[in-house]
Swiss-Prot record:
Cytoplasmic-side positions: 46-56, 112-118, 168-180, 225-243
Topology term for the membrane: Multi-pass membrane protein
PANTHER family associated with the record: BIDIRECTIONAL SUGAR TRANSPORTER SWEET2A (PTHR10791:SF57), RAG1-ACTIVATING PROTEIN 1 (PTHR10791)
Organism expressing this protein natively: Oryza sativa subsp. japonica (Rice)
UniProt name for this protein: Bidirectional sugar transporter SWEET2a
Gene symbol of the encoding locus: SWEET2A
Subcellular location: Cell membrane
Length: 243
């Protein structure tokens, strides 16, 4: 990530050792929770495979996450930024997970949703290819870092907004059956960690999108606590997976 001046966070120093420890601690925590976020939908897809149907689950969070991971992966490579290899590593793993989830969704969706999600998947790779081409062809290294950095902020905001349709479904059905708890909790913890990281670094590009993600995460967790009594999982512990 970059700070508001367009400098790589990896190349900046905050001065105070304690402050630096807090910054890097928040960043490492964010990476850990990001990995947890990537694996959190596994119970949902286990259910989809077991039932042979996507039911009312939405593929949009995984489509948005795939695009976000690809953009952040590109940002973390030396072609765009120096010293942020872990950004590329985490997001390459994330992209593989999101691609696997999307492919599974397509395999078990009805014909209409299969065509829709497949088209969106093609669009995602088309947009990413265009971003790579434009950033290499039209920008030098410094402006390329700014260009891709702003795109990563935009993609993060879109990714965090993707659960809005699920929030609407929860309110309409008064049930959290189709809002996986692991996904909501992991997004909240990841957002809080990176929000703290951005605030400690005074980095606009980090704390703004993750601040939005934190608010949305709180909303989802509040809705889960309020509506879980009306769900089929009512008799199950909060952190149980479907078996």
């Amino acid at each position: 990530m970059m700070n508001a001046l367009g400098l790589s966070v990896a190349a900046t120093s905050t001065g105070s050792p304690f402050h630096d420890v807090c910054c890097y601690g928040a960043g490492i925590a964010g990476n850990i929770f990001a990995l947890v976020l990537f694996i959190s939908p596994l119970p949902t897809f286990k259910r989809i495979v077991r039932n042979g149907s996507t039911e009312q689950f939405s593929a949009m969070p995984y489509i948005y996450s795939l695009l976000n991971c690809l953009i952040c992966l590109w940002y973390g490579l030396p072609f765009v930024s120096y010293g942020v290899v872990l950004v590329a590593t985490v997001n390459s793993i994330g992209a593989l997970f999101q691609l696997a989830y999307t492919a599974t969704f397509i395999a078990f969706a009805d014909a209409k949703n299969r065509v829709k999600v497949s088209s969106l998947l093609v669009m995602v790779f088309g947009v990413f290819a265009l971003i790579v081409y434009v950033s290499l062809a039209l920008f030098d290294h410094q402006t390329r870092q700014l260009f891709v950095g702003y795109l990563s902020v935009a993609s993060l905001i879109f990714m965090f907004a993707s659960p809005l349709s699920i929030i609407n479904l929860v309110i309409r059905t008064k049930s959290v059956e189709y809002m996986p708890f692991y996904l909501s909790l992991s997004m909240f913890l990841m957002s809080v960690s990176f929000f703290a990281y951005g605030v400690l670094l005074h980095d606009f590009f980090i704390y703004i999108p993750n601040g939005i993600g934190t608010v949305l995460g709180v909303i989802q967790l509040v809705l889960y606590g309020y509506f879980r009594k009306g769900s089929r999982e009512d008799s199950l512990p909060l952190l149980v997976t479907h078996t």
